Curated annotation (Swiss-Prot):
Region (Disordered): 1-78
Gene Ontology biological process terms, A to Z: cell differentiation; spermatogenesis
Keywords per UniProt: Chromosome, Developmental protein, Differentiation, DNA-binding, Nucleosome core, Nucleus, Spermatogenesis
Biased composition (Basic residues): 1-21, 31-57, 64-78
Keyword Repressor: no
Subcellular location: Nucleus; Chromosome
Species of origin: Holothuria tubulosa
GO molecular function, one term: DNA binding
Any one GO CC term of the record: nucleus
Protein known as: Sperm-specific protein Phi-0
Length: 78
C-alpha cells in the first residue's frame, strides 16, 4: 500500500485545527466556525461579520469590558 502524501494544506495549523474540530465535541465545532478565518471567502456569514475586527482589537475591547464591569461591581458593593 502506498502511503498517502500529505498535502501542504493539510500540514498547516489551521487545517489541523479544522480537522481537530471535526473530531471534537459540537461545542468545539461551533468555536471553529466562529474563529476568524484567514480567507473571507471560506468564512461562514457570522465569522465574516466578525472578520473586520482584528483579534488584538477584540482582545483589548474584552479587557475594557471586564474592567468596567469590575469597577461597576465594586461601587455597588460598597
Amino acid at each position: 500500500m502506498v502511503a498517502r502524501r500529505q498535502t501542504k494544506k493539510a500540514r498547516k495549523p489551521a487545517a489541523r485545527r479544522r480537522s481537530a474540530a471535526k473530531r471534537a465535541a459540537p461545542a468545539a465545532k461551533k468555536a471553529a466556525s466562529r474563529r476568524r478565518p484567514k480567507s473571507a471567502k471560506k468564512a461562514k456569514p457570522a465569522a465574516r461579520r466578525r472578520s473586520s475586527v482584528k483579534p488584538k482589537a477584540a482582545k483589548a475591547a474584552a479587557q475594557v469590558r471586564r474592567r468596567s464591569r469590575r469597577i461597576r461591581r465594586a461601587s455597588v458593593s460598597k
